[in-house]
Amino acid sequence: MVLMILPFIGSVSVSESLVAMITMCLAYLILKFFRTEIPEGLRELPGPKPLPIIGNVLEVGRNPYLSLTAMTAPRTDVFQIQIGMRPVVVLSGNETVRQALIKQGQEFAGRPDLYSFKFINDGKSLAFSTDGPAVWRARRKLAYSALRSFATKEGTTPEYSVRLFEHVSKERYAAISMFMKLMADFDPVRHIVVSVANVICGMCFGRRYDHNNRSWLNLVNPRRDVRKVVASGNPADFIPILQYLPSTTMKKFLNINARFNEFVQKIVSEHYTTFNKDNIRDITDSLIDHCEDEPMDPMPDADDKIVGIVNDLFGAGFDTISTALSWSVMYLVAYPEIQERLYQEMETVMGPDRMPCLSDRTQLTLPEAFILEIFRHSSFLPFTIPHCTTKDTSLNGYFIPKAPCIYIKQWPVIHDDDDVLDPSSFNPDRFLKADGTEVNKLNGEKMMVFGMGKRRCIGEVIARNEVYLFLAILLVQLQFHAMPGEPLDMTPEYGLTMKHKRCHLRAAMRRGTEE
């Protein structure tokens, strides 16, 4: 973590460094002096003793999902660390997390006022902003209504039951075509990223781009870097003085956000110009329509908020879905016997002459279990987006004051030996009932990839359907293999979403692809 701070400092004089150190020391002493009193009957949060200024950054290290899990064992599912100058409450354990996010959902529904969050969607992000409850609820209601309307919207031709299936089915031609051109040696992540971005772009804006369109690639690929900056541990969020020092990482982060905001703003403006209430083309039209039908009184600047919501839907959906699919392909290659079982089940259910569709999902239990096991085993979302408390509260008998940053660890919840048999092994059957004909919903609900409670992802249903459709279509048409003599490296690289290391794979055709 200390090494993460160094690139943010840049070239700073000795006098500036001394002033910064003195300022931080004074701030640290003031914070210690004004510590909140613990109410009678409640306990102080346990946790490792922090060092002045830097807090517990040395103990947290570069892989917080592992180090914070190690801290849990000798203590409790609720404890406190300090990152830089800022106290951070860490929650883990299935029961504790459910207590906080569901039973005490309102008290843990806030977002911390982190420096980096202010620059996401110009501070208008539904997911990251610190808007008050009235504004946040109005914006969430607007986004949910638009998504629900579009999720059930019929396709443009009888061939497609819903619009999502239409976008995924059309995009698979381009993706599989690219895989086939490079069959002997290709990077799956590159084409998965563009395919997923195109599906979301089609849903949000009614358009798609070629896989080799340089402008589109330059816009989409850097979006994967945004999540690294807002991962648990961005130094400027926790050591305020770093906000005023040169930082190439933050400069890049701001540039990526500004370029994408400009892209979304332009398309939303075009949609306002061409909007027709009798012809809702995409999610942006649906948002405009719902804004006109139900004006959001608590929500100022509705046009800007639509840009923020669309930006959020694109960013969150794009990153989560593309990461899930890229991990899926890696696991197919790592476990070829499971890849073959998946293919055989789909052939049995669907027959050899048609593509998977959404209505098959309830019958295809092994693919559903496979996706859940990928969520669990890869744990590519080790933390939720940071929360904060909206008022003084308590959890498990410990006092938690208003507004500290709350980290909710998903990694140990789904790697707990008490809840999961042999958690280190990859075994999709753990999510099936004994006869293998039905998914065990109780086990599946423990996978908090889309969060829970008041901050649960509103696009969860669409995201799950998209992951299923993409995976199923790829499976029935392609067989994936590792490159000869090149072992797969499944070690995750830490970030808000954890990616595997880029690699090259091979593919073989199972079925022909009609044009």
Swiss-Prot record:
Pfam families: p450
Gene: cyp1a1
Described purpose of this protein according to its UniProt entry: Cytochromes P450 are a group of heme-thiolate monooxygenases. They oxidize a variety of structurally unrelated compounds, including steroids, fatty acids, and xenobiotics.
Cofactor(s) in the UniProt record: heme
Protein name: Cytochrome P450 1A1
PROSITE patterns the UniProt entry points to: CYTOCHROME_P450
Factors inducing expression: By 3-methylcholanthrene (3MC).
Molecular function terms from GO: heme binding; iron ion binding; steroid 17-alpha-monooxygenase activity
SUPFAM superfamilies reported for this sequence: Cytochrome P450
Magnesium in keyword set: no
Catalytic reaction annotation: an organic molecule + reduced [NADPH--hemoprotein reductase] + O2 = an alcohol + oxidized [NADPH--hemoprotein reductase] + H2O + H(+)
Enzyme Commission code: 1.14.14.1
Membrane topology according to the record: Peripheral membrane protein
UniProt record, GO biological process: hormone biosynthetic process; progesterone metabolic process
InterPro entries cross-referenced by the UniProt entry: Cyt_P450, Cyt_P450_CS, Cyt_P450_E_grp-I, Cyt_P450_E_grp-I_CYP1, Cyt_P450_sf
Record: residues binding heme: C457
Keyword Membrane part of the UniProt annotation: yes
Provenance organism: Pagrus major
Top-rank EC class of the record's enzyme: oxidoreductase
Record keywords: Endoplasmic reticulum, Heme, Iron, Membrane, Metal-binding, Microsome, Monooxygenase, Oxidoreductase
Recorded family membership: Belongs to the cytochrome P450 family.
Tissue spec: Expressed in induced liver, kidney, gill and gut. Weakly expressed in control liver.
A GO-annotated cellular component: endoplasmic reticulum membrane
Subcellular location(s) of the protein: Endoplasmic reticulum membrane; Microsome membrane
